[in-house]
């Protein structure tokens, strides 16, 4: 273990500092943003409702769509991918277990590039490719002078016992699970009175079956006045985000999306006026 973690140091300290910069920035972005959004950490967004070390409910579904072995074990690969980003990012920042963390990040980014983003063109592959290139020097060189590995692998530091390392890893892995998801129904009641020439009233949103690309049409209760839609979402989140459209045009342009908080019951009623900012 000590040999695996012992970093290679360059002749001058500033060279190690220069190589530590992309490692630390990469790790911070993964741990604080990309990973924390789908893997339960103390700083994960509260609205995502993730328990500690839980992977977001939607991620195994995305992984299963890759096919092959990913479809056979979607929960495992989803959890490992999210773990690699979130916990691997923390380890990269600290320079602790740097090579294993960098290996996990590299594998995850390769999967993201070729299984998820390949069909969407080279431009969409750039974020994952950027994390891959940032992790590669850490995979080869370790943490350099600027990391905990440099301190912990010095001869004066007591050797880590493999049993204790295995116990720590097991303690970290055991709580991991997939976030539970439930059907949540929202009844949308939209007042469009005062808006002339109402031909079509739609709803777009973040969570399936809604999308930001196409309208779910609302049904008129009182034509040119009150419209209604009932949407059931299978989710583990506490909130969803939507916007209404009128004749294909978005409301609240250049303003934040509407945030609907799911109530404790399975059905929530949401009343709104078109293009009026909710209080």
State where each predicted segment sits.
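Bacterial Sec signal peptide processing site at the extreme N-terminus
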Residues: 177-189
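Compositionally biased low-complexity segments at domain edges in trafficked proteins
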Residues: 179, 268-279
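Perimembrane loop-to-helix junctions flanking transmembrane segments
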Residues: 46-70
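Exposed beta-strand face motif in extracellular beta-rich ectodomains
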Residues: 238-242
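Aromatic/hydrophobic beta-strand junction motif of beta-rich domains
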Residues: 50-51, 188-193
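Aromatic-rich carbohydrate-binding modules that target alpha-glucans
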Residues: 194-237, 247-263
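Extended, low-polarity transmembrane helix blocks
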Residues: 1-52, 72-83, 87, 94-178
């Amino acid at each position: 273990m000590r040999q695996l973690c012992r970093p290679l140091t360059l002749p001058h300290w500033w060279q190690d500092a220069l190589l530590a910069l992309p490692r630390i920035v990469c790790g911070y972005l993964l741990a604080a943003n990309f990973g924390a959004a789908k893997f339960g950490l103390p700083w994960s967004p509260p609205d995502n409702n993730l328990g500690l070390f839980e992977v977001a409910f939607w991620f195994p579904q995305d992984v299963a769509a890759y096919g092959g072995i990913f479809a056979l074990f979607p929960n495992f690969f989803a959890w490992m991918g999210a773990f690699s980003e979130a916990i691997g990012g923390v380890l990269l920042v600290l320079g602790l277990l740097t090579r294993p963390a960098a290996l996990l990040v590299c594998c995850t980014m390769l999967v993201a590039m070729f299984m998820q983003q390949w069909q969407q063109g080279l431009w969409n592959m750039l974020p994952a490719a950027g994390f891959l290139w940032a992790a590669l020097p850490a995979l080869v060189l370790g943490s350099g002078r600027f990391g905990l590995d440099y301190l912990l692998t010095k001869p004066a530091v007591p050797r880590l016992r493999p049993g204790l390392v295995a116990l720590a890893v097991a303690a970290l892995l055991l709580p991991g699970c997939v976030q539970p998801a439930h059907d949540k129904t929202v009844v949308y009641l939209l007042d469009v009175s005062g808006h002339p020439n109402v031909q079509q009233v739609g709803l777009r949103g973040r969570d399936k079956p809604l999308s930001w690309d196409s309208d779910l049409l609302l049904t008129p209760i009182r034509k040119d006045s009150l419209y209604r839609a009932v949407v059931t979402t299978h989710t583990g989140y506490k909130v969803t985000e939507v916007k209404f459209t009128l004749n294909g045009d978005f409301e609240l342009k250049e303003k934040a999306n509407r945030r609907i908080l799911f109530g404790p019951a399975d059905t929530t009623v949401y009343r709104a006026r078109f293009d009026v900012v909710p209080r």
